[in-house]
Amino acid sequence: GNSSIILTERGTCFGYRDLVVDPRSFTVMKSFGHPVLFDAGHSIRKYGIPSSDPNGGTKQFLPTLMMASAAADLNGLFIEVHPDPKNALCDAASQLSFDEAGRLITKYFKIAKFVRELKNS
């Protein structure tokens, strides 16, 4: 078999079109010994709503989920960025502007660095 595997948490559909991320899955996935990524942009999408629909995501949860994944010391992060998110042709409701992405990524890496320093102390 292929040993070059990357696991990705993207949320699981429960209830009313919500994709739910259980942070415990980060630890479970890491236990398999493969790199783990978090698809933050997908995890806030509203399941079953077209990606062009502005009601198709819950962007207000993106910062919290991104920071949780940084604290979990994952190997990578997916986010979707667009110069004009509301006019993006796909996943408009979950896109970050360049400015939003820059601010959140800066915070993300500060948390990730702190967590790694704690692990190594």
Predicted regions and their residues:
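C-terminal helical cap(s) of enzyme catalytic domains, especially alpha/beta-barrels
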Residues: D84-E117
